[in-house]
């Protein structure tokens, strides 16, 4: 089974369109069963997306419509144009750089049968840059969560509190994978990475070595 996760910095990256093309070509060649993306942006002031690519599953509680430059929608369409079809979902968590709807996306080769909108931070203010959410999707009786966590030493929105919410919700599922940007270095002891492993979760990267 192939899983992939990437923080895309979409729309903000230099040479964004060229890098997006490279990424889509790579994904079309590798075709992982599931991949999760973070910082999946769209311009808040952009016009509505005219035609939503096939396979889209709206996430409950998401009141933000897809816009014309939505990164996840672009990836879904570009993959479909290459004959590679994914089921996908997108969830914005906050306003980024005062102009982007910034969120996460999950793409699955198997049909998505359910989606979950999970608030991780104490803040539920869409305009606040520290607001954090997780997007969960169920495909083939397995749950996959795309996450973009806060920092360990953030006194206002600490990683540990967000992790407790995520671990409790995902851990209640029979089988779950967590994919994303945890903002935690694996070689730093007694912080986020050690907390995750100490909570009973396993690092699939290490298991695959």
Region spans (language model):
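Short, solvent-exposed beta-strand-terminating loops
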Residues: 27, 40-48, 142
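A short beta-strand submotif of the Rossmann-like class I SAM-dependent methyltransferase core
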Residues: 37
């Amino acid at each position: 089974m192939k899983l992939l996760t990437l923080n895309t910095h979409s729309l903000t990256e230099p040479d964004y369109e060229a890098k997006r093309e490279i990424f889509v070509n790579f994904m079309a060649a590798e075709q992982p069963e599931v991949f999760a993306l973070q910082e999946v942006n769209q311009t808040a002031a952009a016009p509505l997306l005219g035609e939503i690519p096939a396979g889209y599953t709206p996430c409950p509680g998401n009141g933000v419509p897809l816009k014309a430059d939505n990164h996840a929608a672009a990836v879904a369409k570009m993959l479909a144009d290459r004959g590679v079809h994914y089921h996908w979902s997108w969830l914005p968590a906050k306003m980024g750089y005062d102009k982007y709807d910034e969120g996460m996306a999950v793409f699955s080769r198997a049909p998505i049968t359910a989606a979950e909108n999970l608030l991780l931070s104490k803040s539920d203010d869409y305009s606040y840059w520290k607001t954090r959410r997780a997007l969960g999707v169920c495909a083939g009786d397995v749950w996959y969560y795309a996450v973009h966590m806060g920092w360990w030493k953030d006194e206002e929105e600490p990683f540990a509190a967000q992790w407790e919410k995520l671990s409790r919700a995902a851990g209640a599922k029979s089988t779950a994978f967590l994919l994303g940007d945890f903002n935690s270095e694996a070689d730093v002891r007694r912080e986020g990475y050690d907390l995750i492993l100490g909570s009973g979760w396993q690092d699939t990267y290490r298991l695959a070595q």
